[in-house]
Amino acid sequence: MSKKVKKEKKPTDKLADKTLTTKVLQGIFGDPEKRELKRMEKIVQGINKLEPKYQAMSDDELKDQTNLLKKQLLELRKKADAKTALEKQKLEKESSKKTKKTSAKTIDTKKAEDKILDQLLPDAFALVREATFRILGMRHFDVQMIGGIALHEGNVAEMKTGEGKTLVALLPSYLNALTERGVHVVTVNDYLAQRDAGWNAPVFHFLGLNVGVIIADASFLYDPEYINEEHADERMQHLKPCTRKQAYAADVTYGTNNEFGFDYLRDNMVNEVDFLRQRELNFAIVDEVDSILIDEARTPLIISAPAGDNPDSYYQFAKIVSKLTPEDYVLDEKHKSVTLTDQGIEKVQRLLGIDNLYSAENSRLVYHLDQALRAQVVFNRDRDYVVTNSGEVIIVDEHTGRLMHGRRYNEGLHQAIEAKEGVAVKEESMTLATISFQNFFRLYRKLSGMTGTAFTEAEEFQQIYALNVIQIPPNRPIKRIDKDDLIFRTEAGKLRAIVRTVQEYHAKGQPILVGSASIVKNELIAKYLDEAKLPYEILNAKNNEREAAIVAKAGEKGAITLATNMAGRGTDIKLPEEVKKLGGLVVIGSERHDSRRVDNQLRGRGGRQGDPGITQFFVSCEDDLMRIFQGNQLANILRFVGLDEDTPIHNRAVTKNLEAAQRRIEGFNFDSRKNVVQYDNVINRHRRVVYLMRRKILEGENISQEIKRLMKEATVDLTIESSRVNKKFKQNFLQVFNIDPDLVETIGAMRKPEDRAKLALTAVSEAYANQELEFGPEVMRRIEREVYLKVLDALWMQHLENMQHLREGIHWRSIGQRDPLVEYRTESQKLFEGLQKNLREEVLKILLSVTKQEAVVTDIVDGEEYDTELTQMAETATNKGVNTIDSGVKNLDNEFKSGSSKKTDVNRERNTARKSKKKQRQNKKHSKR
């Protein structure tokens, strides 16, 4: 019997597939990137001509330029608005003509706004350049001006290490801040957000703009009069604590990608307009953009609450899988997956005492088994995670080598690893709100980014974010020498060669940086250097608190530094003059990473700002990348020709094969990220509808029209069938609307659907009018608003859970030759329609049944009011608590789920304020009595 075998889709081989086509097109039309650079160079020439004008100004005159530019912006806006109004009138006239040639034109307000800023750009950039020189003593190079233009125009600017990206961000930030709509400068961690803000804030302050900072659990405003002497770094001493709302109201706000995203979610959970933190999402400049938008692209931000699962099952299955042998399972290292063999299934069934592991009643056992097996076989300690002395399992970022505090693997995997390591298992959690970085950053009106390594991901930036990558030329030519890879037969031979190379350069006095992909390999190299009695500093996620001190000395004469990928990003190793004369920093890569970007980041530590330097990678056939992608074949060939362990080969073909393997992995990851965003786009549409609906209710004082709309929809829905057809007509109707049962029978007996709907709506409207008379219009409006928000929040949380369950099982549809994505879209639409139906019915049921005894909404005291029973009533109806949450990050790339060990009360500010006001007013009432 033949079987249909579905061919596996090959991963996208980015760049390689399009090389020939690109070359042909460039031959005909020229290189578009070069054309862009030439265009920007002309703009810079215009900026340079303005330099003498601003140099001649006094400080006071320079400060006044911001107000003058804002006035100029307003004038240009008025002209643009007038032009837009005329165009709209013209379009309306065209569309009103019933001809075949209807106008398809639309007014692009974003483009119009950017055109206005383009006119101000030369003066704004020249002004910032002069102000920066006066305040910081640094003048923007022409290439930095080009970088600023690229960012303003919504591109990714690739700028090499040491080219001054922090200073470049000043230029577009200032220009776009003139609109008074806010600018967000996004960094990867709290330290960089504070450091960069503290560095640039004096320039913004000099020019009359204020700067805010958003980090985890804190927010600041730059104030030169404020001094916090506890900060050792002078750049951070003037950051004055403030509310989050004040920090977001600043002209320019620095912060981390996590906190910007979390605050967006938190704003869509508040019940009072006053507790909203963010303004509109206008313009974002993302530093290390490849890290945030590519490496963390499949990283949903999650606000979650404990779900209270029993941890005993995790310990039970950790014990079971520890008894399995390699013959009991098949490990797929390429896809990081593991499956049981028939022998393994039989062994597990014996250990569990069951006959059929995969029967329906054992689905929960399969869930625990899968995660325990992955924890045991796929995930390794000191490579994928570390275990602290306090017994906490912390994930290690595979791209940066840093510890990812507050992040947890999802779907029970983190708990399975905790059980494997014998530490306390933390409970699972339920999702309250979530959004991926892909969809969050696409909410911004304009998006741009900068990094040292983006070109290899140019296709993904364009396809997912509509961002073009522009390679900004360095200010000084690169003198670094990148040597060919050395390939060894065994890892031991490779490590001995690394030691010999380190000894050679160390004898000359050159500083050496040895990079590795994991803590395990990092510590293994350290053992080899110990045997050779070579002094070194070691940097990995276990001692990251010493990072600044180690990096500060890494460029000194004779320094040897062993580092994981931590040293590849965000570090700037500066060299003294004597080291430059010796040949600069020597960078040794102890293996190739899955991603070419990570390799390029390591290379980029050497040769900064035109400094000399040498880089070289040492590779063995036993390295993961080589071993997985046919490294054994090469090892056999080397053994056959009699090559010993310590003799390397210089073979460009092997290096090209390695790079091809990297491209295949990158292509696979790209396809995977595209797949994730296709699924995430489905729930993103639901999210946008719900959040828009929620914001309208939150900001609207009177939502009675919305309630009337719900009543009309609900009555039509409930009266489609008569009571003759639907025997549960009366029961279903009374479950939603608390009205006279006899009248419901009359409605159900009517023949025509429109007659049933009309009478039902009249009856329900009368009942609702009676409710309003009972409470009074003002109180009724507050009841409507509070109930609507509470029910919507509860149903949205349930919807997120339902969507997650749907997503987890949808891939099985492919067995029936059905497209899982199409099925997911269809099923999710049904779920969303169910949410809308339940929203109507739950809101109306509560509003028509609530009594004064059940819910005293407000108590007026001297013209003020406070909430009493309403919140309890709504929460009882929804049976959901939204008080204590975890903030963290879920990463589908490596199955991450957030869950910060630190609990955060999402309603803390609101509840504290309410309790305080309530107590004060009660005291007033008692004193009056």
Which ranges hold each PLM region?
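Short, Lys/Arg-enriched, disordered terminal segments
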Residues: M1-V5, H926-R929
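Conserved P-loop NTPase motor core
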Residues: S2-G642, L692, R709, E713
